[in-house]
Design a protein with these regions (language model features):
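N-terminal pre-Walker A segment at the start of P-loop NTPase domains
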Residues: 1-7
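NTP-dependent small-molecule kinase module
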Residues: 148-195
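Conserved glycine(s) of the Walker
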Residues: 28
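Phosphate-binding P-loop
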Residues: 7-15, 70-71
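The conserved Walker
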Residues: 24-25
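Short hydrophobic/aromatic beta-strand immediately N-terminal to the Walker A/P-loop
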Residues: 18-20
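Conserved substrate/cofactor phosphate-moiety recognition/catalytic segment
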Residues: 31-77
Length: 195
């Protein structure tokens, strides 16, 4: 009679999961995350800076290290990012190759002038500021990376938060859903996600 070992097949194990909250500075990511499901650890450079009283650069480096460690240990985690560079998109691609289930909540506005005004307001109320030129540059770069996010993630929700949060797009595995609003027509959403 064959012996049974303590090994469990991968089919019976739950995949590790990443939840990513992404979008340009001033879009309202942090506001929306208060109401959303997260998986601990929740890795957010702003929170790291606040807790550790360190610089923006040190907080960003520590957040990156924490994400990479979680990935190398096949642990589930949540993180928040502007996602205006390929670095975190590449991290998600690597996670996908390792078998992670990836869920993204992407928050944007219809115009970067809204983001600029929100960041100025946040800074006036004691929050962290971001130079205007960086907001504009990151906004454009972040939106340009949305098709890559849609491709790599299993589930994607895109919310227009120009006034109040309104879901304009959802991807579930291989299904796509569109909800136009006054700022985003269906054709504009399709152009945004490159479908």
């Amino acid at each position: 009679m064959p012996t049974v070992t303590g090994n469990i097949s991968m089919q019976n194990q739950k995949k590790p999961e990443i939840i990513v909250f992404a979008g340009p500075n001033g879009s309202g990511k942090s506001t929306i995350t208060r109401f959303a499901k997260v998986i601990e650890p929740y890795i957010n450079a702003d929170n790291i800076k606040s807790v550790n009283h360190c610089s923006d650069l040190e907080a960003a480096q520590l957040a990156e290290k924490m994400r990479e460690e979680a990935l190398s240990e096949q642990k589930s985690f949540t993180f928040e990012t502007v996602l205006s560079t390929e670095r975190n998109l590449n991290l998600l691609k690597e996670a996908k190759e390792q078998g992670y289930f990836i869920r993204c909540i992407y928050v944007l506005t219809c115009d970067y002038s809204i983001n600029i005004a929100r960041v100025k307001s946040r800074e006036a109320n004691g929050g962290h500021g971001v130079p205007e030129e960086k907001i504009v540059s990151r906004y454009k770069k972040a939106l340009a990376l949305i098709p890559g996010i849609v491709k790599v993630c299993d589930i994607v929700h895109i919310y227009d938060n120009s006034t109040v949060p309104f879901r304009i797009f959802k991807k579930r595995k291989t299904e796509y859903f569109f909800w136009p609003n006054e700022y985003w027509s269906e054709s504009k959403i399709k152009e945004l996600v490159k479908l």
